[in-house]
Amino acid sequence: MSSQTPVVTVDGPSGAGKGTLCMLLSKKLGFQLLDSGAIYRVLALAAIHHGVDTESEDALVPLATHLDVQFVAEGDLVKVILEGEDVSKELRKEETGMAASKVAALPRVREALLRRQRAFEAAPGLVADGRDMGTVVFPNAKAKIFLDASAEERAHRRLKQLQDKGLDVRFDDLLSEIQERDDRDRNRPVAPLCPAEDALVLDSTSMSIDEVVEKALQYIESKLAE
């Protein structure tokens, strides 16, 4: 990985606001964007499009190595472009999610996707959104942020999102799901969720998105000036 290209990593638990922060940072800095959480779904979708068996490492590794994908911040959304086509909606389909879990279980595919993610590092810079960006994927990144929020706050945010879509959900159920996922992510044997030693930890529980962006930008600008 080139030390010349500035890389900003944003890690943290589900629902902390990483996606929104990364999208806004990408726009403000003019940097490219990587949504690592979507990369397995993108590969699964590419496999479906090309008729590739989602359980065959031999077939998936070359597809992962040459995966033609871009993440584009547009308006309030991040568009996912696979082989020139906007596949943002397709990525959310249950079929894609099920195929993604099969793909993610294959060690050589994970290794190929790790290399593919690192290939996003290119001028003028990169904002990388994930759970192990600063610890595993880009350990030499110039600026590392760990964005956190209490489980209760993340459950409230998720509740509002789902209610805005007209869905009937219970706060207690969402909170349990978030706590279970946190426990899995923080205690998994490979690349557990934790801040890099040199990361700025931002707790967004009682901060607006504007405040989070302002603090993140101040930190990034100071790190890039070093």
From Swiss-Prot:
One of its GO terms (molecular function) is dCMP kinase activity. It is an enzyme of class 2 (transferase). ATP binds at residues 12-20. Its main location: cytoplasm. It is found in: Cytoplasm. One of its GO terms (biological process) is nucleobase-containing small molecule interconversion. GO terms for cellular component: cytosol. InterPro entries: Cytidylate_kin, Cytidylate_kinase_dom, P-loop_NTPase. This is Cytidylate kinase.
